[in-house]
Amino acid sequence: MTQFGVVVLTMGSRPLELRAAIDSVGKQVNVDTDIVVVGNGWVPTDIPTGVKTLALRENIGIPAGRNAGVPEVDGEILFFLDDDAELPDPRFLERMAKLLSSRPEIGLIQPRVIDPTGKHAPGRWVPRPRAGDHARSGPATTLWEGATVIRRNVFEGAGGWPGEFFYAHEGIDLVWRVWDQGYVAWYAGDIEVNHPVINPTRHSEFHRMQARNRVWLARRNLPAAIAPFYVGSWTALTMVKLAKPGNTEARGAYLDGLREGMANPPSDRTPMKWSTAWQLARAGRPPIY
């Protein structure tokens, strides 16, 4: 049977949801799972027997926390699950394994995300422009990271999640690097995961990190000729969105993030091939916006 290395990242603030997430993985059939719960600044407690734990002394951020869990698990396929997500189908991982087996060109898969209470899923959960029909599968150019399936060799080839990002846009970085290895990132609209609709701006550092990491995305991954267009287009779009009265603080935080990203170069600059930029354009989102 296919073995999945499963990494569940948590800060320990949602014990009921965490247990539901773990249990939903434990109920998967026709696959083997090796599970680790990574406590990001928290010592995991009350974890089911047979599930590994890793306690990080401090909160090192979402992407770095996920990376820390990878060496703890075996499996040729990795599965990253948020602590407030849940698998409603006991064949979720089996279906993912079959998709990867039948489509060797696919390196990463994001499932369709459903709010279990019936709230309308936001368009940002569909990793392509013109979200439209959320049930339609196809190539992914961005990523909702809360239930990510990826081949281990592809993950390692990408250098893992960009740990220094801490929060925001780490999924785009990973998706770009999947494409740059010659693989396809895929949205499986027929395979579902449950996750509540949550306002991303609840994080106090949201706007600063959005801006800083946009700059770092460009500096890490884009050819020098198009990097300024990517940063410029997103800056213009964001400033228009934040132009309404009452957003003065948010605009200031965004500009602070831009300055931070420009002043502090990220690690591991690996400009994507021009052929990758073309593939992303053919998939619906050229890396200039």
Task: Indicate where each model-derived feature is located.
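A short, conserved alpha-helix in the catalytic core of glycosyltransferases
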Residues: 142-150, 154-159, 164-192
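Short aromatic/hydrophobic "clamp" motif used to bind/position activated sugar donors
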Residues: 78
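Glycine-rich, basic loop-to-helix element that forms the pyrophosphate-binding segment
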Residues: 55-73
